[in-house]
Amino acid sequence: MIDRDGYRPNVGIILCNARNQVFWGKRIREHSWQFPQGGIKYGESPEQAMYRELMEEVGLRPEHVKILGRTRDWLRYDVPTNWIKREWRGSYRGQKQIWFLLRLIGRDSDVSLRASTHPEFDAWRWSDYWVAMDSVIEFKRDVYRMALKELSMHLTEHRRPRVAERVDQLVR
């Protein structure tokens, strides 16, 4: 399902623990790390897609998490042409995403990277909220920064990462 501008609707998930560290999944057989994300199926709401992707990629159910916030609007990124399947070239530009900020209220042991028959990740870790983006594929970095910045306002005040100084460091 691609919109008329060439963007595939998608959800992104920033999963935090009680210390506001974020979940990073390592892509299978790759050296890149990313947040869970996935396409929105026809007839599915962004929230329904988020819960489905969370289960498929991380093995967490709705009772394991609490929604803290979501982006106000779609965040978009373009995929470089050499990454686009030949049959999609000309009609596909990239992804538009609604991002969710979740708090893990379950245990770390509830995470299962093998909940799906087609796992996305082969390792995971908790990292600082404003982790450096050098392990994220380059064309997704700006969207990650925008999502982290917008959603940081939903974290508890005494644990909220300092946005301005960290974003400045990440942009360098």
UniProtKB/Swiss-Prot annotation:
Superkingdom of source: Bacteria
InterPro entries, per database record: Nudix_hydrolase (IPR020476), NUDIX_hydrolase-like_dom_sf (IPR015797), NUDIX_hydrolase_CS (IPR020084), NUDIX_hydrolase_dom (IPR000086), RppH (IPR022927)
Family: Belongs to the Nudix hydrolase family. RppH subfamily.
Organism taxonomic ancestry: Bacteria, Pseudomonadati, Pseudomonadota, Betaproteobacteria, Nitrosomonadales
PANTHER family: ADP-RIBOSE PYROPHOSPHATASE, DIHYDRONEOPTERIN TRIPHOSPHATE DIPHOSPHATASE
Enzyme class: hydrolase
Organism: Methylobacillus flagellatus (strain ATCC 51484 / DSM 6875 / VKM B-1610 / KT)
Short motif Nudix box, span: 38-59
Xref: Gene3D superfamilies: Nucleoside Triphosphate Pyrophosphohydrolase
Matches recorded under PROSITE patterns: NUDIX (PS51462), NUDIX_BOX (PS00893)
Thylakoid listed as a keyword: no
Function statement: Accelerates the degradation of transcripts by removing pyrophosphate from the 5'-end of triphosphorylated RNA, leading to a more labile monophosphorylated state that can stimulate subsequent ribonuclease cleavage.
An example Gene Ontology molecular-function term: pyrophosphatase activity
Any Pfam family matching the protein: NUDIX
Record key words, sorted: Hydrolase
Residue ranges of every copy of the Nudix hydrolase domain listed in the record: 6-149
Keyword presence, Hydrolase: yes
Protein's name in the database: RNA pyrophosphohydrolase
Cofactor(s) named in the record: a divalent metal cation
EC number annotated for this UniProt entry: 3.6.1.-
